[in-house]
Amino acid sequence: MAKYRAGRINEEVKKEVSSIIHNDIKDPRLSAMVSVTDVDVTKDLKYAKVYVSIFGNEKAKEESLQALKSSVGFIRKEIGRRVKLRNTPEVIIEVDNSIERGMHIDELLHSIKENKSNDN
């Protein structure tokens, strides 16, 4: 039962954080290509690790990450207002590069397939 509740809390916090990032944060450094890939709330609801994927060049990624990290207080306040929990978790922003790694692997597989078809 506890795992089921934790999963529901993770999904609800993920949905709200994504909405907050896209609709409520007005920082010009934040690019539109930021997506929340996962949220992991601890069992005691004290901390929420928010994994974000940021597309763009390195400078845009760094600026977007700084904008998100400077907005964690606002994000936490909004989570507390929107999600009814006993404790509002402290938000920790982490970068998730899994989508980029997946795209790179897909490109490698595509190039191998092209090389194989050219050899035949």
Swiss-Prot record:
Entries under InterPro entries matching the protein: KH_dom-like_a/b, RbfA, RbfA_dom_sf, Ribosome-bd_factorA_CS
Its principal location? cytoplasm
Keywords associated with the record: Cytoplasm, Ribosome biogenesis
Record's superkingdom?
A: Bacteria
- Localization (cell): Cytoplasm
A Pfam family hit: RBFA
Q: Which GO terms describe its biological process?
A: maturation of SSU-rRNA
Recorded GO molecular functions are: ribosomal small subunit binding
Name a GO CC annotation attached to this entry. Answer: cytosol
Q: Which NCBIfam families match?
A: rbfA
Describe the subunit structure. Answer: Monomer. Binds 30S ribosomal subunits, but not 50S ribosomal subunits or 70S ribosomes.
Give the similarity note: Belongs to the RbfA family.
The protein's role, per its UniProt record: One of several proteins that assist in the late maturation steps of the functional core of the 30S ribosomal subunit. Associates with free 30S ribosomal subunits (but not with 30S subunits that are part of 70S ribosomes or polysomes). Required for efficient processing of 16S rRNA. May interact with the 5'-terminal helix region of 16S rRNA.
Q: What is this protein called?
A: Ribosome-binding factor A
